[in-house]
A protein has these predicted regions:
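N-terminal glycine-rich FAD/FM-binding segment characteristic of electron-transfer flavoproteins
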Residues: 1-128
Length: 128
């Protein structure tokens, strides 16, 4: 499948350090594929080499303003929030209820990405 470009994506699925390693990136790719979305990441993820810097979203990376921005395992540093501020709807999935991103989010799910995201993928596939 052709990957959706970050510049023109209506939906962006973005992953952070909460994914615990590059080997877990598959859930980001799979959710993006089901939604027809682009993938992105936080600066720490790019700095650790889990993803290319071209996918790094934020003040020091690429600013994005999709219709829907889904942040998975991203705590929400001010630099990251500045880069996604133009997003119409922000959905945050994080296991830390105190993550700053929840204050900036339109919708938030407090839960483990490794159980929430596969469940979301299953529900979305069932509706297709």
């Amino acid at each position: 499948t052709d990957k959706v470009s970050l510049d023109e994506a209506a939906i962006v699925v973005s992953g952070g350090r909460g994914l615990k390693g590059a080997e877990h990136w598959g859930i980001i790719e799979e959710l993006a594929e089901v939604l027809g979305a682009a993938t992105a990441c936080s600066k720490p993820v790019a700095d650790m080499g889990w993803r290319p810097h071209a996918e790094h979203v934020g003040q020091t990376g690429k600013p994005v303003a999709p219709n829907l921005y889904i942040a998975i395992g991203i705590s929400g540093a001010i630099q990251h929030l500045a880069g996604v501020n133009g997003s119409k709807v922000k959905l945050v999935i994080n296991n830390d209820p105190e993550a700053p991103f929840f204050k900036a989010a339109d919708y938030g799910v407090v839960g483990d990405a490794f159980s929430v995201v596969p469940e979301l993928i299953k529900k979305l596939k069932a509706r297709q």
